[in-house]
Amino acid sequence: MNYTTQMDAARKGLVTKEMEAVARKEGMDIEILRERVATGKIAIPANKNHHSLDAEGIGEGLRTKINVNLGISKDCPNIEVELDKVRTALEMKAEAIMDLSSFGKTEEFRKSLIEMSPAMIGTVPIYDAVGFYDKELQDITAQEFIDVVEKHAKEGVDFVTIHAGMNQETAAVFKRNPRLTNIVSRGGSLLYAWMELNKKENPFYQYYDQLLEICEKYDVTISLGDACRPGSIHDATDASQIKELMVLGELTLRAWEKNVQVMIEGPGHMAIDEIAANMVLEKKLCHGAPFYVLGPIVTDIAPGYDHITSAIGGAIAASHGADFLCYVTPAEHLRLPTLEDMKEGIIASKIAAHAGDIAKKVPGARKWDNEMSRARQQLNWEKMFELAIDPEKARRYREESKPEHDDSCTMCGKMCSMRNMNKIMEGKNINILREDD
């Protein structure tokens, strides 16, 4: 039996090789997985032309996944530098990479990325439009925006961020409800500017059905972008954000009618006490579609440390139902991330995702922690390094500060609680001041 997309196959009762791969990785019953793909609760971004893909699932009952943003820009156009980041992201087992390239040899970089990456690849096609057409924003036609999406889809991109919820109604709500930081989504601000300059409807909203035809043809998952995501905790959960979320819910149903998989993008900057409610709102208004959040960043005062503010928010968001975390690096709000910035962002995001999985009782999530605790109890340093989320750093810290005795560290020495409890439980003397027999 033929099928067009993962959702189409699932609705026809078919199990694809991508579904089998996801079920195996997650330890989920294949029929439960297939049913959740059929109803849109799980998305498996898997473009038919991405031949190196090792498919992952995003959504209900699955591990929280993380995405890494990278790409070339006018100020940093070196492709090799970004490809080094790609290789590192893959080594660190990021499940997704988004190419946010906006200038230079974007097509060359994107094709290299798709060819080499087993991780799912996402793009924001509007970023590429200005450079691709070599036109000022207001001179790009609606059809040209759509054509860039098709170009990315043909090349093998697994998911595309489309800010279709910023229509004239959403724009009117934004105008009536002033914000401290206006529109901070790059793609959203570009579309809003295009709409204002041309006095026209958002082309991604007006020609949404055409976009869905493209996504269905190549099995591209549509990641509905949040143009009105809050860029400060002051603007969180305001009228513009919620109005757009309601539109995204309507667009979700239209996509599912065409068997196109959907993810919903979310905040953004948000105080801790608003995060749980926002997860409920998205799942309710967008019919249980997977939720993909940037952070949330829980305070605005920490430039240089936003991988931490983001990890705090990401852990809370994941514990309350977010399915996919976009990493944030220490360079957020300051510069294009370096390779080291990227590593720190990945680690912080992976910690947040795992902490969320423990809280929402994803099967097997606690096993890793229990194994680490057992290794600590046994003072098995090699096992601890092997299990660490960042083995290199854990090993380096111990080697930089060697203890006198191998069964302790330089923090506690022979007063180590693990060491002493092990000895006492075995009926031995702890010998803090004397050498062991």
UniProtKB/Swiss-Prot annotation:
GO terms for biological process: thiamine biosynthetic process; thiamine diphosphate biosynthetic process. Its EC number is 4.1.99.17. Pathway: Cofactor biosynthesis; thiamine diphosphate biosynthesis. Gene3D superfamilies: 6.10.250.620, Radical SAM ThiC family, central domain. GO terms for cellular component: cytosol. Its cofactor is [4Fe-4S] cluster. Coiled coil: none annotated. Pfam families: ThiC_Rad_SAM (PF01964). Keywords: 4Fe-4S, Iron, Iron-sulfur, Lyase, Metal-binding, S-adenosyl-L-methionine, Thiamine biosynthesis, Zinc. [4Fe-4S] cluster binds at residues 409, 412, 416. Substrate binds at residues 69, 98, 127, 163, 185-187, 226-229, 265, 292. It comes from the Bacteria. GO terms for molecular function: 4 iron, 4 sulfur cluster binding; carbon-carbon lyase activity; zinc ion binding. Zn(2+) binds at residues 269, 333. It catalyses: 5-amino-1-(5-phospho-beta-D-ribosyl)imidazole + S-adenosyl-L-methionine = 4-amino-2-methyl-5-(phosphooxymethyl)pyrimidine + CO + 5'-deoxyadenosine + formate + L-methionine + 3 H(+). Catalyzes the synthesis of the hydroxymethylpyrimidine phosphate (HMP-P) moiety of thiamine from aminoimidazole ribotide (AIR) in a radical S-adenosyl-L-methionine (SAM)-dependent reaction. NCBIfam families: PRK13352.1, thiC. Belongs to the ThiC family. This is Phosphomethylpyrimidine synthase. It comes from Alkaliphilus metalliredigens (strain QYMF).
